[in-house]
Amino acid sequence: MLAMGDRNEFCSLDGNNSPKWSVFNALAWKLTPDWQWLHLDGGQAQLMGYKRAWITYNRSRILSAARSNLIPGDFLGCVILNEVGGDPPWIKRNLVMPARQYLFWTKPPMQTSEGAIKMQLQAALSVLGHSGKELSWKQQNELTACLETDAFNIDVVARFLRKMILFDYPNINTQTLTDEQFVIAGSRYNRGTARPLKDFIQSLKDLPGKSDRTYTEYGRAMLRHRAEVKALLGL
């Protein structure tokens, strides 16, 4: 077992991380009534409070990774707001990924999402320049440990987001996104690259209730929280 400060094949493990989303947090989110007048800090308030605190704690890292990868800080921050919290990380690491080593009818282990900013192992590996590489169980655990390190997690997500922008818009200034580009590139983080750009553009035009509108729901949520994320990042 690697300790913080050690190095594995993929990264140096840094112990300076935001507090993890715990079972207690998840139970307070799922089981405590969302009654603000009782000040229980449960329900959606528990989840959103954690998300905001995570971004605030890692503000300098988020802004630095965005600058290094020539993407807007609020774009990276909005993906983070969507991703952090939810299922405690040990569920994927200790239950889901081990089961996927043997249960052939489930998703492959490399499609397991790990890290506070949830990201599939295969996506992280592609950013590191090893697309399609098969990892041993030991290597999967090492990459998971890296994704559970905030600095690595933020950087690899920022690098992947730049790829998602350029996938549809190869000739643009990636530091300045229109609302459409913001929504579509953000939705690519969640939906991947299998679907053509025209489907996402049509999804943006679709009225509520149409099934294809779901293709851009992720990016729409990002756009709704954009002003709040900017404030958290001091932008």
Features from the language model and the residues they span:
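Catalytic glycan-binding domains that act on GlcNAc-containing polysaccharides
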Residues: 6-235
